Amino acid sequence: MKTKTKPEIKSDILSWWLLIVVPLVGIVVVNLPPNLRFILDRFSNTIPENFDANYRYHFSEGLRNNPNPKEAIQQEIAFYQQRLAIDSRSGLNRAALAGSYLKMARATGEGGWFLLAEQAAQRSIADLPFDNKGALLVLARIAEARHDFATALRLAKQVGSDNEEAIALEVTSHLAMGKVSEANAAAEALVNRIPNLGSLTLRALVRESQGRDAEVLQDYRQAMAVEEPGEVAGSARARSLLGRFYARRGQFVQAKALFLEALRLAPRYPLALIYLADLETRQGNYREAEGYYSKVSAYSGGVETVFDRIVDRGMARVKDLQGDAIESRRLRDKAEAGLRQEQVSGSGGFGHRRDLASLLLEKGRSQDVAEALALMQEEVKIRRDAVTLDTLAWALSSAGEWQKADRVMAEIVR
């Protein structure tokens, strides 16, 4: 058996962000002003009649006056900063500020907010070294995003198994490491404890990794049945992930309908926009794909975010398919420069070593293949999920090590 030598760029390049950086429940996106939201309702007119009614969002009236989450987070930050101006040694207030910084990082995708969250959490623990679960959870999420899973799990254990966010951390960390049995046990415990939109979505992701497709759909339907009006962003996330599930199985009409429904809820949601762009690319609709990628960049307002490299690579693929080799090379070089800078910046890079390896494999030069293989041999020491193993197999086959590549692929299908 020969392993693939040049797979297409998949939306799997976002997996680390989906499972780690994005929170369990009530994720935050930066929405359009309410008076512009109903322009996006036109999306619903394009949704096919056979769209599963279970996936419709049933609180549309509540979208009319949905506030801008970014402004709400800014108010939170200002509130805790004022509290700390009065009592600068308050560990609890600083832990809350760290949590608000982390919310803003998730809302904007800007790396600077993650750094502020980490610094605030560390100082909070210095001021309040005992019973400081809020600060520990912030540090655990940041460690996990940097693929320091051992630290993330250690911190989650310190928080305790009676904390839903700590259990969610166990799910995502174990899943990223390829420890599916442990992830499944944690997901079951979480759903048994709190069967809500977030926990059921997490269990669906675990079951998808196990190939339990019927149960995946059951979990998503149950998740949407119990969703509440106040968790619009979590509802958008669930539909985006379910859309990805359908897209992976070639059910493009259902997938697109779910992505559009997600954007009706959260018009600037980058996850849905990137998945839509990927879907349009796969179907040969390159102009539409470019449009969705461009929206991700435009909504960031020119500020660097964690999505920039994904957009650059996606656009490079579109240009390549359009026959524009010069622009495709420019975009790949831009993405590579950004990924390399993150590797040496000391900011952690948030686990982009695999992305850099994948990009180098796309370029295909012998020196790039050698570097990519070295990167992946290091990466699998800390995580062995399916996407990581797939990238390692790609690197091995590109280097002519077919037997080793086949053994890695066999590990994936076990």
Where are these regions (language model features)?
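N-terminal leader/linker segments that initiate helical-solenoid repeat arrays
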Residues: 11-19, 23-134, 145-147, 154
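TPR-repeat structural position
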Residues: 73, 107, 114, 149, ...
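TPR alpha-solenoid repeat register
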Residues: 93, 134-135, 166, 199-200, ...
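Residue-level recognition of tetratricopeptide repeat
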Residues: 99, 103-106, 141, 172, ...
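Structural motif corresponding to the intra-repeat A-B loop/turn of tetratricopeptide repeats
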Residues: 104, 108-111, 146, 177, ...
